[in-house]
Design a protein with these regions (language model features):
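Signature for the C-terminal beta-barrel architecture of outer-membrane proteins
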Residues: 2-161
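Flexible glycine-rich, low-complexity coil/linker segments exposed to the extracellular/periplasmic environment
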Residues: 157-186
Length: 186
């Protein structure tokens, strides 16, 4: 994919990494950078914070690999159809992925919870990409795959609760090249 407009978002961040054997654990804290016009005058945005813990365990039985993660997001000035308020959103996720002979698979489930002003946040996403690859001789290969994504949405813009999944920092055309809208009601 080529890079889309308004895609880059720089962050000031700190990250700790632990790697041993088949385990990889990363913890981080980040804030988006507010870009100013002069040289060396950019600062961290005090209104937004992003933090998390991401763990990967590779080479489990049955050629499985497993990701488990927690992501946190705080936005003091979040704007949705329900209005403007402080948003604190937590995401718990798991991803199972791997390859067995010619079959490859990638299954991911995420659940979000938190607060938006006086309302509650409850949202989810489920994504899968499963494929089968045929060798056509030499370096040529043909892969057939099925990709399915399900994202929760909000059904009542008049209540204070949010049920729309927030992808935090999606690429411009997250769903497809033809998508006319994004994933959340902003």
């Amino acid at each position: 994919y080529r890079e889309r407009p308004n895609m880059r978002l720089s962050h000031d961040a700190v990250m700790g990494i632990y790697h041993r054997g088949n385990w990889d654990v990363r913890v981080f804290l980040a804030r988006p950078v507010v870009l100013n016009l002069e040289v060396f005058d950019n600062k961290s945005a005090a209104s937004n914070s992003f933090w998390g813990l991401y763990t990967v365990r590779e080479n489990l039985p049955f050629t499985l690999n497993l990701d488990l993660y927690y992501l946190g997001w705080r936005n003091l000035n979040a704007i949705y159809d329900q209005g403007q308020a402080e948003e604190i959103r937590h995401t718990l996720g798991t991803r199972i992925w791997g390859k067995r002979k010619k079959l490859d698979y990638n299954l991911e489930f995420l659940y979000q919870f938190g607060k938006f002003g006086q309302g509650d946040i409850h949202a989810y996403a489920l994504a899968t990409d499963t494929g089968y690859t045929w060798s056509l001789g030499g370096l040529k290969k043909l892969r057939f795959s099925l990709r399915a994504d399900v994202y929760s949405g909000d059904d009542d813009p008049n209540d204070s609760d949010l049920n729309s999944f927030n992808p935090f920092f999606p690429k411009g055309k997250h769903i497809s090249q033809l998508a006319a809208s994004g994933l959340i009601n902003q």
